Amino acid sequence: MTNHIHFRCPCCHGSQYRTSSFDVSDMNPFGAKCIFCKSMMITFDNISQYLNASRLSLDLKK
């Protein structure tokens, strides 16, 4: 079990987020949303799955 989960925004590639119990869903089990564009955050363990599904580039620049 890890104590730290790294999130990344698929839209703006930001890594700052907020969590809320109101945002928890099947697609967003942690309830994490980007503080900049309000998109659902994804974790790095499922980022390849997300990128293949939406055909985004793998550039994760800050």
UniProtKB/Swiss-Prot annotation:
Expression induction: By cold shock, 10 degrees Celsius (at protein level).
Residues that span the membrane, as ranges: none
InterPro entries: YmcF-like
Disulphide bridges: none
Superkingdom, taxonomy of origin: Bacteria
Protein family according to the UniProt entry: Belongs to the YmcF/YnqF peptide family.
Further comment: Probably uses the non-canonical initiation codon AUU, which may limit its expression. Part of the Qin prophage.
Official protein name in the record: Protein YnfQ
